[in-house]
């Protein structure tokens, strides 16, 4: 691509944007990030890492983010006027190229000496789910895939995932079976909203970490995990079946929640 600057967008605590900033620094490239929301008073969590990694950060309103194309045009045009060669990565890395990493992940999982009956993954922008679906198709394994939405609804994700998979088919020439995507998406666990948690949800995060030594992040994996637990309790998962839970990281997202955790621990 002959680019010298990586450009992407997302929420202020975007794990994807932090990964883009890291990739840019690691490969000697510049980085510009367009983040959704007002400039915060404190620089913490993923935003702190963005800045430490040298990213040029710009803030756009929630209203602006309703048209991502305008944001892309704004930042890319500015960089080009300044003599840079930008490479735009869509929000969440959710496109055909971004799916490749999860296809590889599924290939590795398929080599485990155990087969999986169910696979659980968080749904934020659709790229991870699309890659997992494509990976299972490519690897010839057939677990029942569950995408637990952390924002938006089933109709939104069906459209986004189908778009990514069509793009993958066009770019890489691999035929994909789209049947059943809608039934695989569970949008009942968004809760009070994207990146927002109830005290009960955070209590369950703490309980699971203290019992298992595995820390979830409050935005994505916590809600996916709670969705999985709900399926187990409701009988949707049968006793003795094997489950694969995809942990997508995101631990820096815990730190902007420090005031909520403080309240929890102070009153224990």
List PLM regions with ranges:
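Alpha-helix C-terminal capping segments
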Residues: 1-2, 19-30, 133-140, 227-236
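Active-site-proximal loop->helix
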Residues: 18-63, 155-167
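Glycine-rich phosphate/pyrophosphate-binding loop at beta-loop-alpha junctions
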Residues: 99-184, 246-268
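Active-site-adjacent helical/loop segments in soluble small-molecule enzymes
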Residues: 181-239
